[in-house]
Amino acid sequence: MADKYILAIDEGTTSTRTIIFDHAGNKMADAQREFPQYFPKPGWVEHNANEIWNAVLSTIANAFIESGIKPNQISGIGITNQRETTVIWDKKTGLPIYNAVVWQSRQTAEIAEQLVKDGYGDMIHQKTGLVTDAYFSATKIRWILDHVDGAQARAERGELLFGTIDTWLMWKLTDGDVHVTDYSNASRTMLYNIHKLEWDKEILALLNIPASMLPEVKPNSTIYGKTKDYHFYGSEVPISGMAGDQQAALFGQLAFEPGMVKNTYGTGAFTVMNTGEKPQLSDNNLLTTIGYGINGKVYYALEGSIFVAGSAIQWLRDGMKLFKKASESEAAAVASQNDNEVYVVPAFTGLGAPYWDPNARGSVFGITRGTTREDFIKATLQSLAYQSRDVIDTMKKDSGIDIPSIRVDGGASNNDYLMQFQSDILGIEIDRASDLETTALGAAFLAGLAVGFWKDLEDLKKEYKPGKVFKPKMSTDEREDLYTGWQEAVAATRQFKHRPRQSK
């Protein structure tokens, strides 16, 4: 395997990356390219699917140029992606009929709210494991079909295809030969029955979405198809692994046993627990989702999605201009001299799990004349840890499983202050991955298993490289006192409902 490699495409919310891994899981190349974000109206977030495709092609080329590795040295390709983001395109031309509607976008909130008002929320939860929310793909499909002239009729004639970003990239790489998704991405559409492992006819009928639009659903580690040689520099390479970003990170963290938990601190923060081979429906607003399907078995997960994590640090940098580099936030937090009396609730786009309150807005509590820039930065960092505790406590309640430690990754987990505070406020060990790119590594592992690059899960476990471990230093009394303050801050935030009149 010395001259063979696995290539992973990691298509995120703000940028695309291509990473090439060797057999030991080492990065041999890492190419990244950002692409534009579109905000047509307040609360709307869209992407141009062709710009994403061009970014993918660009990063593949740059990864080969940077490393000197040849396309014919790639044994398999893994794809991981921002989940829920919805693309609808013309089957013949391959052209999207509208921008991709991004997972963060709230433009379909009215559709989701109407489903709940009409009493369908519980049925949808029982079948899909999800709460009824604009976050997921189903309402986005309905919205596009409603807002593009003639789209519903074209869909009913079988002229249109739907896909999340994994499906779109697979279709493009194979030049339209393969229209598939995987268990993990399908389970985030709000259209997939996670018990029967099939698209749910009742929900499709409810939303008037033609089944002909939908991709075939396959396991996460299998050969789906091959690249067209003209898209991959003369080589036809198997595309053999696929998973939504958070499930890929779970796999990349080698969390193969029930009860193992990972937390990824990206734009949002996503806590995922492997719950084994039976779906465990949450009574407390967590999402039940498919972790991955491999070797003829399907493994389920509980997930808590926090909408604002790393983006809160970006807000401090770009919106508030409190520092120039995100890395400066750590030194500021350490320099803060206050007693943690300031709380920032970063509900910029509502609150995610376990509250699912789309109407909440960001707030700050506990400031005095003596509050400093450093105090404000520290409180914002702490909000990431408090939100994660909200989810972890709920996860314990739902699963009945004690959580002795958490494996963490993602950009904000680089912040030692945040990771120590996370350990303190949870009272458990935090294990930070040595390589924070576990999402791409998970996609690579899935792809490599399908083509024999790695033999089995035991073979993968040999590649685990522990990073830094953070252990709690805070007393139980202090921990619970601080967390009580956070709970009060969230409750007060949710009470504030006033919105100024829109100027015409």
From Swiss-Prot:
Leading EC class: transferase
Q: Which residues form the signal peptide?
A: none
Which reactions does this protein catalyse? glycerol + ATP = sn-glycerol 3-phosphate + ADP + H(+)
Q: Could you say which protein family the record assigns here?
A: Belongs to the FGGY kinase family.
Q: Which residues carry this modification: Phosphohistidine?
A: 231
Locate the residues binding sn-glycerol 3-phosphate. 13, 83-84, 135, 245
NCBIfam families per record = glycerol_kin, PRK00047.1
A GO biological process held by the record: glycerol-3-phosphate metabolic process
What EC number(s) is this enzyme filed under?
A: 2.7.1.30
List the source organism: Pediococcus pentosaceus (strain ATCC 25745 / CCUG 21536 / LMG 10740 / 183-1w)
Which pathway does the record list?
Polyol metabolism; glycerol degradation via glycerol kinase pathway; sn-glycerol 3-phosphate from glycerol: step 1/1
Assigned GO CC terms = cytosol
Instruction: State what inhibits or activates this protein.
Output: Activated by phosphorylation and inhibited by fructose 1,6-bisphosphate (FBP).
Q: Which gene encodes it?
A: glpK
Say what the protein does: Key enzyme in the regulation of glycerol uptake and metabolism. Catalyzes the phosphorylation of glycerol to yield sn-glycerol 3-phosphate.
| Protein's name according to its UniProt entry | Glycerol kinase
Q: Does the keyword RNA-binding apply?
A: no
Self-association state and partner proteins as the record states? Homotetramer and homodimer (in equilibrium).
Residues annotated as binding ATP are: 13-15, 267, 310, 314, 411
PTM per UniProt? The phosphoenolpyruvate-dependent sugar phosphotransferase system (PTS), including enzyme I, and histidine-containing protein (HPr) are required for the phosphorylation, which leads to the activation of the enzyme.
The record lists glycerol as bound by 83-84, 135, 245-246
Question: Per its UniProt record, what InterPro entries does this chain match?
Answer: ATPase_NBD, Carb_kinase_FGGY, Carb_kinase_FGGY_CS, FGGY_C, FGGY_N, Glycerol_kin
One MF term from GO for this chain? glycerol kinase activity
Pfam families the UniProt entry points to: FGGY_C (PF02782), FGGY_N (PF00370)
Q: Which UniProt keywords apply?
A: ATP-binding, Glycerol metabolism, Kinase, Nucleotide-binding, Phosphoprotein, Transferase
What positions does the entry give for ADP binding?
Answer: 13, 17, 267, 310, 411, 415
